[in-house]
Amino acid sequence: MKRIVLSVVVASLAALAPPAPAQTPATGRLMREKLAHTQRILEALTTSNYDLLARESVALSQVASAPGWTVLKMPEYRRHSEEFLRVAEDLAAAARDRDLDLAATRFGALTMSCYQCHKYIKNMRLAR
């Protein structure tokens, strides 16, 4: 009987515990850095600033390669992360080639990659 009561108490305390934070402080910094680079890429595309486009595209790829980027070890998250890095590298290649139309297309794919990953993480948390 004591075990049952103890189990109920432990389960109740676990249920009352605050949920795990949505992201670590390091991941939050990387996401804000990613957002800043993405905003500057949009600026570069809309102003035809090839140098800014190339610089920010490379910087964005570097953010996605940082160790703090892959904090979750789930296969689906890894797939989203690899897709983001691939598209970011494609964007950097279009920037090097000074192809604004292709860069704009890659930027759209990059945005969808972000959206799909954030949607996955949100749905995963809601399912808990």
Language-model features: where?
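Bacterial N-terminal signal peptides
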Residues: 7-15
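N-terminal signal peptide c-region/cleavage motif recognized by signal peptidases
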Residues: 17-19
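General helical structural elements
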Residues: 6-7, 36
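Sequence context surrounding c-type heme c attachment/ligation sites in exported
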Residues: 23-128
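Positively charged n-region of N-terminal signal peptides that target proteins for export
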Residues: 1-4
